[in-house]
UniProtKB/Swiss-Prot annotation:
This is Protein MGF 360-9L. Plays a role in virus cell tropism, and may be required for efficient virus replication in macrophages. In addition, inhibits IFN-beta-induced IFN-stimulated genes (ISGs) transcription. Mechanistically, degrades host STAT1 and STAT2 through apoptosis and ubiquitin-proteasome pathways respectively. It is found in: Host cytoplasm. The lineage of its organism: Viruses, Varidnaviria, Bamfordvirae, Nucleocytoviricota, Pokkesviricetes. It comes from African swine fever virus (strain Badajoz 1971 Vero-adapted) (Ba71V). One of its GO terms (biological process) is symbiont-mediated suppression of host JAK-STAT cascade via inhibition of STAT1 activity.
Length: 125
């Protein structure tokens, strides 16, 4: 199985952080591609995990979301307020250390999107 296929399989299951992290950080898979796969499978947790890891292809992601008739995801990706989560180490390759690091992980960018949705909704984006 090639790396992109492995990444695609990893992104099918929502909240599959350990496998996505390992594919992107340890094996060198493209984090933006992981975000695109997650958009295709409508896995919001994975989408925001990818953003936390540094995915930044928001325009392409919005286009893909619209193609998949996912206006909610496209609206979330339209917010211009996301950034990489510096608390996630991008150098760790030991699966046990990664597992411990991600044990209590909560996406800072998903929290931002959630607060925006609660306060303003996504209709005006």
């Amino acid at each position: 199985m090639d790396m992109d296929e492995m990444l695609r399989w990893a992104c099918r299951k929502n909240y599959n952080y350990l496998t996505i992290y390992y594919c992107c950080v340890a094996l060198g898979a493209d984090i933006n591609q992981a975000m695109f796969h997650s958009i295709q499978f409508y896995n919001i947790g994975n989408i925001f995990f990818c953003i936390d890891l540094g995915a930044n292809a928001f325009e392409e992601g919005k286009t893909l979301a619209h193609q998949k008739d996912n206006s909610f995801i496209a609206s979330m990706l339209s917010l211009n307020c996301y950034s990489m989560n510096d608390s996630l180490s991008l150098k760790e390759t030991d699966p046990e250390v990664i597992k411990r690091m991600l044990k209590d992980y909560h996406s800072k960018n998903l929290s931002i999107a959630h607060k925006h949705y609660i306060n303003d909704g996504f209709n005006d984006i």
